[in-house]
Structure formats: structure tokens, C-alpha cells
Amino acid sequence: MLQLKKAGSQALENLRSEGSFPPSWQSMEELETTTNDIVSRYLDERFKVSRELGGGSLLTELLDRVLRTSDTECMDDTKLSEAEKLELVLALDRQNHKMQLYPRYVELLLSLLEEVTTGEQRKMRVLELASGSGGLALALAEEALRKNLPISVTGSDIVPKFVEAGNRQAAAKQLPVNFQLLNAFNLPLFPEGSFDLMVISQSLHHFTPGQLAIMIAQAAQQTKTAFVGIDGYRSILLTGGVPLMASIQCIPSFALDGLISARKFYSELELDLIAEIATGKRDHTVICDWPLSILTVRFDGRRPN
């Protein structure tokens, strides 16, 4: 319901009709500013279109505007200690295991990697951004090991305790995963093509449109195959469902994070717009695999499935 695809598609057409779209940019700073500005203009234009359409479109647009928030999740609060943040990401890890989300993510990523491994006798290299306590990176490495697939997995986060926790788990499980301290939208200058796949899951909404565009642009420079972003699907159902599921663990701040996150999920057309600005191309898809939105940006010339 909160996808507003009819009004959103018309709003995108209106923006494109203004010319010089997608816009050019010369630096990551300019990309960030430009993307934030255009996404803001897109939402304003969508509101105008919704008013013209009237009825259900306008009501849904108004509801979307009421629900949207720029509040910061507790786990991103600079006043929170790293130990308290770790408690929250471990709660998220437990929830992902209970909901069997990691197997879904791993299946998606392995299908992409198996395309690359066909005919190539080398390790496939994966970098996960904002990996938290490392659940996905560990699950991916474990499944690759089980299938005897030649995959090298690097997890990363900006919080030192997350990195330490990930490396401890990797050592305990004897998995070939290395966790590094990295800023997801200010990556070091890895050599071109250092990775085959760059991934970020359940964190897209933690970043502004401009920061997401930077991540995609960096991936285009350093990744051979694709950037994959996985997050919750923007909908009324998940706005209530995510905090409800989070509340089961009886951690008030985690339940609050669930509510804030669900209100911040990007719509498919917003993700589509951000990817186009970042790459200047249409070599990407955004699909719904309920309850997920999956953005896949290809860098190898192949059209995403």
C-alpha cells in the first residue's frame, strides 16, 4: 500500500521530463547532495501527483507522510555504549534465525555467485557492509563450505565491538570469514575489482539516500559482478509487524528500533531512483520477495533477473 507505484511512476516521469536525468556528479560529496535533493523532489512531486489523482492515492500518500520518520534507531545512537549496541544487533541476529531469513539471503547470494564461478577456477570474493554481529557473513561462509564452493567472505562494520564479535564467532565455528572495521560509505581505496559481490542487508534504511548512492557508486568502482541491497518492504503490514516481532524478545529499545525501521523502509521506486543516480544507468532491478525489497545492481553487463 505504501509503495504508491502509480503516483510514483508519474512523479519519476515528470522529473525525467525536466532534462539532464540522471544528473552527472564529480565527487562522492556531490553525489550525496544531489541524491538527497532529487529524492526529496521526487517525494514532493509524488505528493502533487497524488493530489491530482485524488481518492485512495491521496489518502495513501498522506498516510505515508504521517508514518515517515527521520528518527535515529537506538542501535545508531551515539550516546549508546558499544556493549548496549551489541545487545541490540545480537537480538536482531536471533530474530533472523527464528524467521529463517539468513537461508533466504544466502540462497539469493549463492545464485549470483554460482553464475560467476561457472568456468572460473578461483575464489569468489564477497564484502558485506554494515554486517552487525556477522550473522549473514557467517551463514554464507558456512553454506559455501558445506557445498564446497570457493568463496572468500569479508564482513565489516564501523563499530569495533561488532567486528570483534564477528571474528570471535568465525574462529569458534572455524569458518573462513574475516571481519574488518570499515565505514560503509567511506570505504578505503581497494584495487579495482577487488570483490565479486558487495552486499548490505537489513540496513538500507539506516542510511540517507545520498549515503546509499555513495555505497553503490563505490561498489561500481571496486566490485566486478553486483551490489545487492536487501531490506524490509515498505508496507502498512510491516509497520505493525516488525515491532510486534521485535517485542517478543522483551527488549524495549529493540522493539522501538523495529517500529522506527519499518517507518523508514524505502519504497521500490525510491531504491530504483537512488541506483540510477549513483550509476547513471539502468543496470539494476528492485523486486519484492515478501517481506523483502531486493535491489540488485549489476556491473558485469548482465541484466539482473
Which functions belong to the PLM regions below?
Residues 186-192:
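Short conserved loop adjoining the S-adenosyl-L-methionine
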Residues 282-292:
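Conserved S-adenosyl-L-methionine
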Residues 127, 133-186:
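Class I SAM-dependent methyltransferase SAM/SAH-binding core
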